[in-house]
C-alpha cells in the first residue's frame, strides 16, 4: 500500500511534466537554458546562494535572458537594462505585472490580497491608490516628521553612550531598531525599542518572523516549487502556516489598540476612518495586509542600506572625509541635520545612490508573473512564467557604469557621458509595481546616514578591510554584521540627551 502512495503521485507528476514542459518546447522559442536539468527537479540543484551572483554567472554563459525550470515552475531571468526596460514599459508592463503564487503569499499575505502579492487588477490599483495618496503621500509623511527626528535622536543618544567608553558597536541591530521604530510608530503609534519599553520580546519576534519571510519568499525555498515534497515529510508549508498565525495575531493586537485610541494620528487610524465609510472593502484583513506590507518592505531594507553605506565608507575613508566635510560646511556643528537639508547635500545623496547601486536591498527584484504569452528579447515567454530581474547585475554592467565594481559616489555628479546615469538604478523596482514607499525609504536612509556622519568620527575595529560578503535571502544582508568604533563629535555635547532610549 505504501508503494502505491509513493509511486502514484510521482507517476502523475511525471506525466504532467511530460505534457506541460516537453510538449510545449515544440511550440515555444524559449530563451537559452543551462543544459543540466533533471526530470521533476529541473534546475533546482543549480540554485545556490547568493542567487544574484549565480544568475550573473549564468547570464555570462547564456546571455542577458535565460530560462530555468524550477520544479513545477517556469522562470526567466533578465540581467540587462534594455530587456528590463522592455518588460517594464508600455503594454508589456501590464502583462508582466502579476505575482507568482507562493505559499508565503497565500498564508502570510492573506491569500494573495496584499499590495505586494496580489495580481494586477482593480484590487491592486485600489491598494496602490491608497498607499500613494493616503499612506505615503508627501503630506502624510510630513505629519510624521517629528517621529523620524525623535528616532534619530534616540539612536544618536544610544550610540553616544557606547562611544564615550570606547565600546565597539554592532550597527545591524542599532539600525534595525531605528527603522523598525520609525515604521511601526508611523503605522500604529507604538514604540518597540527604548529603555522605557516593555515589549522588546514582541519586537524581537516580529524581527524573527520578518526575517523568515524575506529568507523564504520568492521561490527561495524548494517547498514553493516542489509540492510533492510534503508527501515525503516536507514541513515548509506547516512552518509557513505557523508563522502566518503568529503574525496575524500580532497585527490584530496592534489593530485593536488603534481602534481603542480613536484620536490617534497614525496610518492605521486613517485606514480605520476609511473603514467606517466602506466597511465591506476596508476589512480588518485589508488593513492588516497594508500594515504587513509597509512594515516588512520598509524596516529591514532601510536598515540594510544604511549598514552597507557605513561599511563602504569605512573601507573608503577619503569618501567618508569628503561627505563629512560637506555636512560640516553646509550645516556645521551647532544643529542636527534635518530632512530639509538633504537637497543641499548632493555628495551625501551620491553616497546613498552608490550604495543602492552596489548593494541593492533586493538584488533580484520581487518576481513578477506573465498574465499571457509574451515576447521578451525576441524569445517566447509563456503565460504564468516567473520573471526575475537581476538588479545587482544591471547595476554592475560595464556598458552602463564606469569601473562598475568600484565604490565611487562621484559618478553621479551629472556629467555629459552616456554612462553613470542615476536614472538607471532600479533598486526599488520599475514600472507599475515600483515600490510605493521609495520616498519614505530615501528620507530615512539619507537622514540617518547623514546624522551618523555628522555626530561621530568612525573607524574600523582593526586594519583589515570590512568583509563585504553577502548573506542569503531576498533581502541582501551582510554575511558578517558590521562592527565599528565611533567617537562623539562636538555637536553631541550641545544636544540634550534623549532619555527614552
Swiss-Prot record:
Enzyme's top EC category: oxidoreductase
GO biological process, alphabetically ordered: indole glucosinolate metabolic process
Main function: Involved in indole glucosinolate biosynthesis. Catalyzes hydroxylation reactions of the glucosinolate indole ring. Converts indol-3-yl-methylglucosinolate (I3M) to 1-hydroxy-indol-3-yl-methylglucosinolate (1OH-I3M) intermediate. This hydroxy intermediates is converted to 1-methoxy-indol-3-yl-methylglucosinolate (1MO-I3M) by indole glucosinolate methyltransferase 1 and 2 (IGMT1 and IGMT2).
Membrane topology, as annotated: Single-pass membrane protein
Name of the encoding gene: CYP81F4
Keyword Transmembrane helix carried by entry: yes
E.C. designation(s): 1.14.-.-
Residue ranges crossing the lipid bilayer per the database entry: 285-305
Cofactor: heme
GO molecular function, one term: iron ion binding
Protein name: Cytochrome P450 81F4
Subcellular location: Membrane
Record-linked Pfam families: p450 (PF00067)
Family note: Belongs to the cytochrome P450 family.
Amino acid at each position: 500500500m505504501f508503494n502505491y502512495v509513493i509511486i502514484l503521485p510521482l507517476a502523475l507528476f511525471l506525466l504532467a511534466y511530460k505534457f506541460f514542459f516537453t510538449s510545449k518546447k515544440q511550440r515555444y522559442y524559449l530563451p537559452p537554458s543551462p543544459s543540466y536539468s533533471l526530470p521533476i527537479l529541473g534546475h533546482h540543484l543549480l540554485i545556490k546562494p547568493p542567487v544574484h551572483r549565480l544568475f550573473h554567472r549564468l547570464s555570462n554563459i547564456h546571455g542577458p535572458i535565460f530560462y530555468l525550470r524550477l520544479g513545477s515552475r517556469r522562470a526567466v531571468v533578465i540581467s540587462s537594462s534594455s530587456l528590463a526596460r522592455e518588460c517594464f514599459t508600455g503594454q508589456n508592463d501590464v502583462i508582466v505585472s502579476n505575482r507568482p503564487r507562493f505559499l508565503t503569499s497565500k498564508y502570510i499575505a492573506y491569500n494573495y490580497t496584499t499590495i505586494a502579492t496580489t495580481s494586477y487588477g482593480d484590487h491592486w490599483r485600489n491598494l496602490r491608490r491608497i498607499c500613494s495618496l493616503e499612506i505615503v503621500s508627501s503630506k502624510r509623511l510630513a505629519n510624521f516628521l517629528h517621529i523620524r527626528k525623535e528616532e534619530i535622536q534616540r539612536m544618536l543618544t544610544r550610540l553616544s553612550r557606547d562611544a564615550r567608553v570606547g565600546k565597539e558597536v554592532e550597527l545591524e541591530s542599532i539600525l534595525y531598531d531605528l527603522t523598525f521604530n520609525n515604521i511601526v510608530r508611523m503605522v500604529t503609534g507604538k514604540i518597540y525599542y527604548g529603555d522605557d519599553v516593555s515589549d522588546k520580546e514582541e519586537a524581537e519576534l516580529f524581527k524573527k518572523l520578518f526575517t523568515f519571510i524575506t529568507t523564504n519568499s520568492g521561490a527561495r525555498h524548494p517547498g514553493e516549487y516542489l509540492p510533492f515534497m510534503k508527501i515525503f515529510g516536507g514541513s515548509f508549508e506547516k512552518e509557513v502556516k505557523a508563522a502566518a498565525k503568529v503574525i496575524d495575531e500580532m497585527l490584530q493586537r496592534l489593530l485593536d489598540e488603534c481602534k481603542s485610541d480613536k484620536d490617534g494620528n497614525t496610518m492605521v487610524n486613517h485606514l480605520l476612518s476609511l473603514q467606517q465609510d466602506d466597511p465591506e472593502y476596508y476589512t480588518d484583513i485589508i488593513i492588516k495586509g497594508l500594515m504587513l506590507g509597509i512594515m516588512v518592505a520598509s524596516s529591514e531594507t532601510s536598515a540594510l542600506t544604511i549598514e552597507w553605506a557605513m561599511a563602504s565608507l569605512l573601507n573608503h575613508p577619503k569618501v567618508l572625509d569628503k561627505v563629512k566635510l560637506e555636512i560640516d560646511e553646509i550645516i556645521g556643528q551647532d544643529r542636527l541635520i534635518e530632512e530639509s537639508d538633504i537637497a543641499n547635500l548632493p555628495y551625501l545623496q551620491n553616497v546613498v545612490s552608490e550604495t543602492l547601486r552596489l548593494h541593492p536591498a533586493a538584488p533580484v527584484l520581487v518576481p513578477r508573473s506573465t498574465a499571457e504569452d509574451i515576447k521578451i528579447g525576441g524569445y517566447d515567454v509563456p503565460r504564468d512564467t516567473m520573471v526575475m530581474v537581476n538588479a545587482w547585475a544591471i547595476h554592475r554592467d560595464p556598458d552602463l557604469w564606469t569601473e562598475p565594481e568600484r565604490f565611487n559616489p562621484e559618478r553621479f555628479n551629472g556629467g555629459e557621458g552616456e554612462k553613470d546615469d542615476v536614472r538607471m538604478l532600479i533598486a526599488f523596482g520599475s514600472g507599475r509595481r515600483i515600490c510605493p514607499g521609495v520616498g519614505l525609504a530615501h528620507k530615512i536612509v539619507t537622514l540617518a546616514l547623514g546624522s551618523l556622519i555628522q555626530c561621530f568620527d568612525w573607524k574600523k575595529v582593526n586594519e583589515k578591510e570590512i568583509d563585504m560578503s553577502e548573506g542569503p535571502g531576498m533581502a541582501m544582508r551582510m554575511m558578517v554584521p558590521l562592527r565599528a568604533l565611533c567617537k562623539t563629535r562636538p555637536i553631541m555635547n550641545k544636544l540634550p540627551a534623549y532619555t527614552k532610549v
